[in-house]
Amino acid sequence: MIYQGNRITVSLLDDGIANMQFNAEGESVNKFDAETNKQFDEAVSALEKADNVKGLIVTSSKGVFIAGADITEFVSHFNKEAAEIEKWIVDINGVFNRFEDLPFPKVAAINGAALGGGCEMTLVCEYRVMGDKAQIGLPETQLGIFPGFGGSVRTPRVIGIDNAVELIATGKAQKPAEALKLGLVDAVVAQDDLQEAAVDLVKKCIAGDLDWQAKREEKLQPVKLNQLEQTMAFSTAKAAIFAKANPKQYPAPAIAIETIEKHVNLGRDEAIKVEAAGFAKAAKTPQAESLVGLFLNDQTVKKLAKQHTKNAHDINEAAVLGAGIMGGGIAYQAASKGLPIIMKDIKSEQLDLGMGEASKLLGKMVERKKMTPAQMGETLSRIRPTLNYGDFGETDIVIEAVVENPKVKHAVLKEVEGLVKDNAILASNTSTISITYLATVLERPENFVGMHFFNPVHRMPLVEVIRGEKSSEEAIATTVALAQRMGKVPVVVNDCPGFLVNRVLFPYFGAFDLLLKQGADFVHVDKVMEKFGWPMGPAYLIDVVGLDTGVHGAEVMAEGFPDRMKPDYKGAIKHLFENNRLGQKNGVGFYKYEKDSRGKPKKTADDATYALLKDTTDTDNQQFDDQTIIDRMMLAFCNETVRCLEDNIVATPSEADMAMIMGVGFPAFRGGPCRYIDQVGLDNYLALCEKYAHLGKAYEAPQKIRDMAAAGETFYPKA
């Protein structure tokens, strides 16, 4: 044994070939945390002293090769000064460079995901062999940073500038065939043959059949392109990348490209220093703080959901009441994940609509070659459309997705409860109606919960699981488990009108209505909020949701929270609805919609809208600058999020932030409403609340904000 650690071992195989194996004891995956970095340094030192090693393979004992750096440890470094971050990165790179400089050939045997630091570990080897089930990539820009362990230096020298820029700037993981085509790996073999193939490559290097030293030398020298070729490569890459991501919102890809451009004409050691400076620059951006925080929040939400499933019942068959687009979407989602589901409606045309929706979604999967026609048929066969309850006796969970009317829901829920087994779970897909209220007609309210999917079901990852006053932990656990099985991210919330997401969204629409009443232009407001980072502005969003849905939801919310959600005037949204402008569903809302050449609705501002809005606009129109619009819209949204934490509707800032990003498209690079408040600063945020408090209760600072500001606290403590 050349080196023995609890993260890394280096053993000698036959013929002078060593095996550096990453094997983090007690961990499900290998990653570059502080202890692994320490042992990597020690292992390299041992190899530098070994005189009996002729070549080396790098392997993993886990299903994952190396998942990358430990993000939880990264956060503590990001709060340091840029110079300290640079030094930390340069020091780690010193070990990677020493490994690369070892006087014998090295081959990485990539058996699973080699991401971030894992990919960078393979790049310090001369050759890379990849298993046919593995993946490789540099996803750091998705966290607001970019590769810091030499990845931005070595990839342009291995796969070319244009390919390297795309790999790093998009953060997309590569499948084996893609990686081979790029030149990121040298061979793809069956998983079972991986170590043998890696050893064979090392033997060829030792025998002189492969010039491994030339391969290494390429990575140590500047990129071999003249200035004109470099300029063309970078110009093309920048145009492609910036068309996909706004560098003001997501600066990491731009910083990565700028950094690569600075170091491509340098040797490795100098280039590494440039990379470290670029990494520190990206790490100090608020977007990096937000996106790394988002990654950690995602882990937190998944852990909490897993804890909720401890008492879950087995689910062998589900049912959905109400077909149509929503029911069809729920049925599709269940069936596509292998779960048999009954879809019941009282009208055959609704069943046809539901099956049509499922068929359409599956057809698109076939078109994209993500599914074969045979698999599509098999998936569709898991959905059983029916007009009666004959098959409900053995169903484990029934999702009610009928019209958003409490009387109809009461009737349907009461009826189905008498037809299912005693321990079957009933879940309502209501978006606003109290679960506790809906449970009043049930004999077994403990088996009843809310399960709020977002539209379109196949695209929106969030499911709110709502706990009513009498909902049992088993019912919550089973519903959370079902959401996970359907490929969704469940967040458990307590019952109130609108639950979490809609309760927060409606004050945002209220703030929009008030701005329009006071003279703001809806097109201008949309542009400002889209520039802020929302995928669509509030006018466009309510058009997509449907003004009828919005008005109905607003009435429910006004009844639940009259102090801040019941306006004393008729707003633009209600006025347009009363004039039969429903949004995209009938072609006219705030905007007018016409189909483009691909059949997609295209919006244009409509003179008829402006004419109608004169009826709801104050005579003394005000002009609003962009920051005022942002402040007023975001205060209403963020204040209600904080009130949901105060009222224990949602348990943690992590869950609140993830729900808003996944449920309504809160700008991911801002990290969620709680992270946004932290970045504005609690004192500054409180001052904004006081500035706009005269507009109404929705703008007044929640007590939690006052208390936190007084105590100098934040939602996310600084590491």
UniProtKB/Swiss-Prot annotation:
GO terms for biological process: fatty acid beta-oxidation. Substrate binds at D298, N502. Residues 1-190 are annotated as: Enoyl-CoA hydratase/isomerase. Disulfide bonds: none annotated. The active site is at H452 (for 3-hydroxyacyl-coa dehydrogenase activity). The record marks E120, E140 as: Important for catalytic activity. Residues 313-719 are annotated as: 3-hydroxyacyl-CoA dehydrogenase. Its EC number is 4.2.1.17, 5.1.2.3, 5.3.3.8, 1.1.1.35. The keyword GTP-binding does not apply. Pathway: Lipid metabolism; fatty acid beta-oxidation. The keyword Ligase does not apply. NAD(+) binds at M326, D345, V402, V403, E404, K409, S431, N455. GO terms for molecular function: 3-hydroxybutyryl-CoA epimerase activity; delta(3)-delta(2)-enoyl-CoA isomerase activity; enoyl-CoA hydratase activity; long-chain-3-hydroxyacyl-CoA dehydrogenase activity; NAD+ binding. Heterotetramer of two alpha chains (FadB) and two beta chains (FadA). Involved in the aerobic and anaerobic degradation of long-chain fatty acids via beta-oxidation cycle. Catalyzes the formation of 3-oxoacyl-CoA from enoyl-CoA via L-3-hydroxyacyl-CoA. It can also use D-3-hydroxyacyl-CoA and cis-3-enoyl-CoA as substrate. PANTHER family: TRIFUNCTIONAL ENZYME SUBUNIT ALPHA, TRIFUNCTIONAL ENZYME SUBUNIT ALPHA, MITOCHONDRIAL. This is Fatty acid oxidation complex subunit alpha. It comes from Psychrobacter sp. (strain PRwf-1).
